[in-house]
Amino acid sequence: MSSTVGRYAPSPSGRMHLGNLCCCLLAWLSAKSSGGKVVLRIEDLDAVRCPREFADLLEADLAWLGLAADEGGRKGGPRGPYYQSERSAIYEEYYQKLVRKGLVYPCFCSRSQLHAADAPHRSDGQVVYAGTCRNLTPEEIVLRTTRRKPAWRVMVPDETISFVDGHMGPYAENLAQDCGDFYLRRADGVFAYQLAVVVDDALMGVTQVVRGADLLSSTPRQLWLYRELGLPAPEFYHMPLLLAADGRRLSKRDGDESLEHLQARYTPEQIIGRLAYVCGLQNVPDPRTPAELADGFSWQRVPQNDIILPEGLF
């Protein structure tokens, strides 16, 4: 077996839709085609939105499709726990490393203040934090804490972080200009995705991260966190987003085709074959198992632009 360790890192807030399934398929194929393995980590930081029964369903769905993980989830393994809701003490340890470096500060900004019309925005519409609370005095912090419980941000340097994505190619961002100081912890104490994912991937031995292109812009700040925390960074492969026939992003909230509905009409092989077809891995939407696709898998066959699902394919 090769040293490649891929992973699934789903948030179990509902049944998986086609976009989630496509990401899992590519993650599995990318790892298995080089003789590697796949770890399943359940990203249930928000335990209210992500009940355990959804996590169990998700794991069963992956097995039904032939995409079962080698480690993690209910199967367990040597680097657990594999549920983020059970890893708070681990996140606390690494959070405190950043606190000791003097990089963490309280933020009292409300949602309306952050999204005000005059707030800095990226070209994709995301808000870049203006640093409003970065230089508050100790006295100001004490006063504001009596009025509002703060969230906690990390100070980023005026530095450009660049890397070569395994699928999308070169990418770079200036942390101060394009990202801004970002959240590490919510006001209710829950740790933020950016910190948790970095700590988890490093401690679970993940060497290859496959995820949607919507997370490409998160990578520079995560690479910076890996460096600040002294953790090894994986390789990244960002896949194109799967869009509905009308150009919308697929969403659990919008009721887009979930696996629950697909299972009533298709076999696992039919679903996998159709996903492989839209990803460029085969020329016709014939039924296939993941194992049948692994031998000939190549990222060069996967498009870089977003994929619009053909009408009537599912």
Where do the protein language model's features map onto the residues?
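Noncatalytic linker/hinge segments flanking ATPase motor cores
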Residues: 17, 81-89, 146-148, 194-199, ...
